From Swiss-Prot:
Keyword Membrane: yes
GO biological process: Gram-negative-bacterium-type cell outer membrane assembly; lipopolysaccharide transport
Protein name: LPS-assembly protein LptD
Keywords from the named record: Cell outer membrane, Membrane, Signal
Extent of the signal sequence: 1-24
InterPro entries for the chain: LipoPS_assembly_LptD, LptD, LptD_C, OstA-like_N
Subunit description: Component of the lipopolysaccharide transport and assembly complex. Interacts with LptE and LptA.
Gene3D superfamilies listed in its UniProt record: Lipopolysaccharide (LPS) transport protein A like domain
A GO cellular-component term linked to this record: cell outer membrane
Pfam families: LptD (PF04453), LptD_N (PF03968)
Biological role: Together with LptE, is involved in the assembly of lipopolysaccharide (LPS) at the surface of the outer membrane.
Family: Belongs to the LptD family.
Subcellular compartments: Cell outer membrane
Length: 783
């Protein structure tokens, strides 16, 4: 063997050029550096100033040279220059042209691609290369293929004639794209196909005259790889997405979604970035739905914006609208934020300073129910102007603040008034705190003025003009005690007792409508809030002491493993206890609220539990409760959950805003569910969920997913069965029957070249198939 290392090709073979034929030395210098094997991605390595001047190393069994013209190496030939490596049976070096021609079992790599060809020609000065009858594989991106002719015309730029490309590994021809010509630019991460056809297991499935696709993660205009699916709701579906890189600050993705039973839907997402923030516009349009011809064209639209301008202004917009109320139940859609059967339509502009902020808010909605005049419809906010002032540490241990807003409420609800509300709320706070405890005393004055339009109002208690002033005094204190546990080694336990006194005088408020006030969640932490409602239309009177404690356990790494909290309210005025407001209650009046208990548990990071309960000792009844238990390992999880709300509790807490409780629920809420997901093997995974209503003895929903994921494609199967409505009133009619919607679907798609697993494949979560209930982790330990 012989090894040559010079600064220029001519110098590397100069000794051989003086003789017409020479036998290369058979000995090898074992101390020389190991030559690179060409199997690594080297595209990000810095390039030399003059690549053609790099040293060349040649290994061969035999060398023949013609003076001043060429040198021919044969027998186990390896030529290395910088990142380029050629191995072949024969290699000819043309000195004058600085060209290498390799023939016979040619293997080439340059840190970006490796190939196996019958012949290769490399122009060392220009970095140009041609390959014939080639199998190739990219080293910096997933991808391989075959070609009759491959030409490299620049750094990471390739032209492929009569070739194919796939992201599948060697030996797997599940799919490939064939074309008469393919241009691949790894710098731009884009591939251009001429006369392409997609083959699945060597069978052509579609043809296009021209196609560009991205082959990386950067933004490039072109087709994204399509997905195919079948569902009992829409029949066969085929989606072809196209990405448009319009400018550095905005782009567009359009998707043609063909549905066998409905027609072709055009979906688009336009994204932008400006000095005022970032946003996106989503649209979906289905011309003349063939499954529901009476509905005609069906569409959906959403505009979202969120941004900060000049560090003081913040702009937020979320506006959604659909063509009809059944749009989301008939079509899979990613448009809109839905709450309680409504599409949110709101915009907010906020200005913030060091000590104050002001905001203008407009909120509307689109109802997704048939009843557009019900008395339970929410109010539109048209608009609300707020101003808040903060003066922390005005003096030592003294904070001042002011909350104020002017709001206009409008509604289409039958018998409900519109109104203008002005609210001013100054506050004073005296905080004390140290490492082991805190004590805060707060005083506020809530002044509110209402001008109510009563023309269409049926509630005789309401008054046109109302002025309400209510003081509020609150004092809350807590301490943190800590010790090393006795029974558990290396564990630390805390005990955190807490107490609060709250006084709000009783004030007649039945002459005021409910505009934006909703009941806040009631749990252990809610015992120590000053407000029962989120808005100011109802200021719940109070003369009460809340007390409770929590204890936490931390392991040696100070990771929280167990948290138990319990507490109760003692009403100094028993008539203020909500439990005493039910006229149908037969129990004696009590001065105590139900006990609220919360518990979170994490055992060895694989068994998790969260539970909460409110138990009324006087009535010996559970008012509400929830419980979640989850077992999780690296390959999957199983979770069981249950929630319960007593009907009397619903009546006592929200009876003012919902008057037809007896028509909505028979025995309150009692629902159980189980969810599971498991990686069956490296390629197979499954997930599912089941929810059951114990008050109606009917299933709410069940869903099952099964997915196969290979290295370059996936297929997902989904079956769902959802309770959509009832034939009759299930509360009052014993013969009412449930109406279910069944749907089976499968999705198939490509992985690689910048694509990922699609929605609905069952790999993006058990809630990816449009089901209303999904997986969540309601565990609140500090981990």
């Amino acid at each position: 063997m012989s090894c040559f290392s010079r600064t220029f090709l001519a110098a590397s073979i100069s000794a051989a050029l003086f003789a017409p034929q020479i036998q290369a030395e058979a000995s090898v210098d074992d101390n020389r550096a190991q030559l690179p094997n060409g199997e690594q991605c080297l595209v990000n390595q810095p390039e030399p100033t003059n690549p053609g001047q790099q040293p060349i190393n040649v290994e061969a069994d035999k060398l023949e040279a013609i003076n001043g013209q060429k040198a021919t190496y044969s027998g186990n030939v390896v030529v290395v220059q910088g990142k380029k490596r050629i191995a072949a049976d024969n290699v000819t070096l043309h000195q004058q042209e600085n060209v290498v021609v390799a023939e016979g079992n040619v293997q080439f790599s340059d840190g970006e691609i490796k190939t196996h060809s019958t012949k290769a020609t490399n122009h060392l000065n220009t970095d140009e290369m041609t390959l014939e009858n080639t199998r190739y594989q990219f080293l910096c991106e997933p991808g391989r293929g075959e070609a009759v002719y491959v030409s490299k015309t620049g750094k990471a730029v390739y032209e492929i004639e009569d070739g194919s490309i796939t992201s599948c590994p060697d030996g797997d021809n599940a799919w490939r794209m064939r074309a008469s010509s393919i241009d691949v630019d790894q710098n731009e991460e884009i591939a251009t196909f001429y006369n392409p056809r997609l083959e699945v297991q060597n069978v052509p499935v579609f043809y296009l005259p021209y196609l560009t696709v991205p082959i990386g993660d950067t933004r490039k205009t072109g087709f994204l790889y399509p997905t195919a699916s079948y569902g009992s709701r829409n029949g066969y579906s085929f989606e072809v997405p196209i990405y448009w890189n319009l400018a550095p600050q905005y782009d567009l993705e359009t998707t043609f979604n063909y549905m066998q039973k409905r027609g072709t839907q055009l979906n688009s997402v336009f994204r932008y970035l400006t000095d005022f923030g970032a946003g996106q516009i989503k649209s979906e349009y289905l011309a003349d739905d063939q499954l529901h011809t009476e509905l005609g064209d069906r569409w959906a639209f959403q505009y979202e914006h969120n941004g900060i301008f000049q560090q003081a202004w913040k702009f937020e917009i979320d506006y959604s609208k659909v063509s009809d109320i059944n749009y989301f139940s008939d079509l899979d859609s990613g448009v809109g934020n839905r709450e309680d059967g409504q599409l949110i339509q709101e915009g907010r502009a906020t200005y913030r300073s060091d000590n104050w902020d002001s905001a203008l808010l407009v909120r509307d909605f689109q109802l997704l129910t048939k009843d557009t005049t019900s008395t339970n419809l929410p109010y539109r906010l048209m608009p609300q102007l707020s101003y808040n002032y903060y003066a922390p540490e005005t003096m030592k241990y003294l904070d001042l603040d002011l909350v104020s807003h002017v709001s206009r409420f409008e509604t289409d609800a039958r018998g409900k008034p519109s109104a203008t509300r002005v609210h001013i709320e100054p506050g004073l706070k005296i905080p004390f705190s140290n490492t082991w405890g805190n004590w805060t005393t707060e005083a506020r004055v809530l002044g509110t003025y209402y001008q109510q339009d009563l023309d269409k109002t049926t509630d005789a208690k309401l008054e046109e003009s109302v002025t309400r002033v209510i003081p509020e005094i609150r004092s809350v204190a807590g301490i943190v005690l800590e010790r090393d546990t006795v029974l558990l080694d290396d564990y630390t336990q805390t005990l955190e007792p807490k107490i609060q006194y709250l006084y709000v005088p009783e004030k007649y408020q039945d002459n005021i409508g409910l505009y934006d006030s909703t009941l806040l969640q009631t749990d252990y932490y809610g015992l120590f809030r000053s407000r029962k409602y989120s808005g100011v239309d109802r200021i719940e009177s109070a003369n009460q002491v809340s007390y409770g404690a929590s204890t936490r356990f931390f392991d040696s790494n100070y990771k929280e493993r167990l948290n138990i909290a319990f507490g109760q309210i003692f009403y100094l005025d028993s008539k203020l206890n909500p439990s005493n407001k039910n006229p149908d209650s037969t129990s004696d009046k009590t001065s105590y609220s139900a006990w609220a208990v919360e518990m979170d548990f994490n055992f060895a990071d694989y068994l998790f539990y969260h539970g909460g309960i409110q138990y009324d000792i006087d009535s010996q009844a559970v008012q509400l409760g929830n419980s979640t238990l989850e077992y999780r390992v690296a390959s999957g999880y199983i979770q069981a959950n249950y929630r319960y709300v007593a009907k009397d509790y619903i009546r006592n807490t929200v009876g003012d805003s919902i008057t037809n409780i007896d028509d909505i629920t028979r025995d309150g809420i009692s629902q159980a569910g189980i969810l599971a997901g498991y990686q069956l093997s490296r390629k197979w995974s499954a997930s599912g969920q089941y929810y059951y209503d114990l008050t109606t003895d009917e299933a709410l929903e069940w869903l099952a997913n099964l997915t196969y994921t290979s290295d370059c494609w996936y297929v997902g199967f989904t079956y769902s069965n959802q309770l959509k409505s009832w034939n009759g009133n299930f509360v009052t009619d014993p013969y009412a029957t449930p109406i279910y919607e069944n749907n089976f679907s499968f999705n198939i798609g490509i992985i690689g070249f910048g694509t990922s697993i699609g929605a609905g494949s069952s790999m993006t979560g058990v809630d990816s198939a449009g089901n209303s209930l999904g997986y969540g982790r309601p565990f609140f330990l500090n981990n």
